[in-house]
A protein has these predicted regions:
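Residues within well-ordered alpha helices
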Residues: 1, 35, 58, 126, ...
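N-terminal carbohydrate-binding accessory modules
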Residues: 1-36, 57
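Short, conserved loop/turn and helix-capping segments at secondary-structure boundaries
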Residues: 23-26, 81, 85, 283-288
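Substrate-binding/catalytic cleft of secreted carbohydrate-active enzymes
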Residues: 33-34, 43-279
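Surface beta-strand/loop "capping" patches
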Residues: 162-164, 168-171, 291-306
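A eukaryote-biased signal for short, well-structured alpha-helical docking elements
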Residues: 270-299
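A residue-level signal for beta-strand positions that form part of recognition/binding surfaces
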Residues: 4-7, 104, 183, 300-302
Length: 306
């Protein structure tokens, strides 16, 4: 529509510890998106899944851009024709069911796929022909194809997009690594773990039990250090907050950046014990940083020195 936008995004990795499945209640999704917006974000990437109708409705109301994906995170794309047909059917179903929602601006085939990218590009072209109201991409990370209308990745042919190297500096950006001719979004920026907050264990009253945190707590007690648990949590959490500030600001300084997708605002217990969030797995604050303070480095307008 001719309006420039810089996507300040987070991942939603389908983490629902109480139920094991996403809520179908608009009010719950309104709570989640309002929380995300309060930290300066305008965009949510659903990591290799598509949320229910309630999420799109809430996003329309709150004002949140969404990226839905097919349930594809595989190393051998194109090997099984029946599986490929399933993905195409799912693609059309998602577009038919949710395509009228204005919040639904991006769609991707899935996460870090490998294999036959001709198959992935064919899906992109079919989606574009079926419903041209949003932008499409073959895969989040790994390979850029000519049909891509945006590209999300760690790296291009010229180097890293995400901020995993170098020393903190106010003169540090990623302009030199954005040579692709479509908007480039930095993939899964952040990923800085902190020590667990053992006070969260009591929140796990549903289908998921926090047995990993129970093991960590028992080990710490066995070594006579349990009384230091909160110190470890707050010290490492403060470090993570500072690192995310550096990540966000470096990409905001990059005039060629299309945006970023932070991993994460929320913890990701779906793949090991990834305590990467300033919010816990329930989208609730850990008390490490206020939304107001976080927005100083993540907002439509951020004061930066170079």
């Amino acid at each position: 529509n001719g309006r420039d936008i810089h996507l300040r995004g987070v991942l939603d990795c389908c983490v629902f510890p109480l139920t094991g499945y996403p809520s179908t209640d608009v009010e719950e999704w309104r709570r989640i998106f309002t929380t995300i917006r309060s930290y300066g974000m305008n965009h949510v990437r659903f990591h290799s899944w598509c949320p229910p109708e309630a999420a799109f409705t809430a996003a329309d109301e709150v004002g949140m851009y969404l990226q839905a994906e097919l349930p594809m995170w595989i190393k051998d794309v194109g090997q099984y024709p029946a599986r490929r047909d399933f993905f195409e059917q799912e693609m059309y179903a998602v577009l038919e069911e949710y395509g009228n929602h204005p919040s639904f601006i991006l769609m991707c085939n899935g996460n870090e796929n490998e294999g036959d990218f001709a198959v992935l590009e064919d899906l992109v072209k079919k989606a574009q022909a079926h419903d041209g109201r949003r932008l499409y991409s073959a895969s989040t990370a790994r390979t850029h194809v000519p049909a891509d209308q945006f590209y999300t990745s760690h790296v291009t042919e010229k180097g890293w997009i995400t901020v995993y190297e170098g020393k903190p500096s106010t003169d540090w950006d990623r302009n030199e690594t954005s040579a692709i001719d479509v908007p480039v979004i930095a993939h899964e920026t952040g990923q800085r773990c902190m020590y667990p907050n053992f006070d969260e264990i009591k929140k796990y009253t549903g289908v998921v039990e926090a047995r990993n945190m129970e093991v960590f707590r028992e080990r710490l007690a066995r070594h006579g250090m349990l009384h230091q648990a909160d110190d470890f949590f707050r010290a490492t959490g403060a470090h993570t907050v500072l690192q995310y500030k550096e990540v966000n600001e470096s990409l905001l300084r990059s005039s060629k950046s299309g945006g970023f997708q932070l991993l994460g605002l929320q913890d990701f217990p779906g793949q090991g014990s990834a305590f990467v969030g300033i919010l816990d797995a329930f989208w609730e604050s850990k008390g490490l940083v206020t939304p107001e303070k976080f927005r100083e480095s993540c907002a439509p307008t951020v004061l930066l020195a170079r």
